[in-house]
Amino acid sequence: MKRIEEQARRLDQEYQAIGQLFDQFCQQAGTLAEQYHFFNWPDYEDSPPLSRAFTLLGEPRELRLRCQPGERSALNGLIQVVSEDGTIDASLGFRADGQLLLESGKLLDNPPGLLLKLLLGAVWQHKPQDEITVQPH
């Protein structure tokens, strides 16, 4: 029973840390809206917890935080760019200590740069197929 309680306490701490990292990421990444005008990052927050509403190229989107099990029963965070229809356009995984999963560095090393990567990934996902495929003339 003691081991289960310790594991539950650890998972709760990791969950809290992931939530705090997401909040800090959103606060720091918001400066990107001042540099580029292809997306709008509102100052007010009407979004549910662990998410952030914004617009990308005039279309409503949401930045969502999800948690998922990782190696050795650790909890990982997953930031997702989600379109209005619920499609996940881009995502970025990280551990509770902020270490990124699929690239070097930490989540808070350069939040505006990471958000820009996510946004560009989201735009690329929604490119019409005829623009992606080169048609022979």
Kindly give the residue locations of the regions a language model identified.
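Charge-rich, low-complexity N-terminal segments
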Residues: 1-44
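Amphipathic, interaction-prone secondary-structure segments
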Residues: 36-88
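Ampiphathic alpha-helical segments that act as solvent-exposed interaction surfaces
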Residues: 83-137
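Alpha-helical context
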Residues: 1-5, 9, 55, 95, ...
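Terminal low-complexity, poorly structured segments
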Residues: 7, 28, 53, 111-116
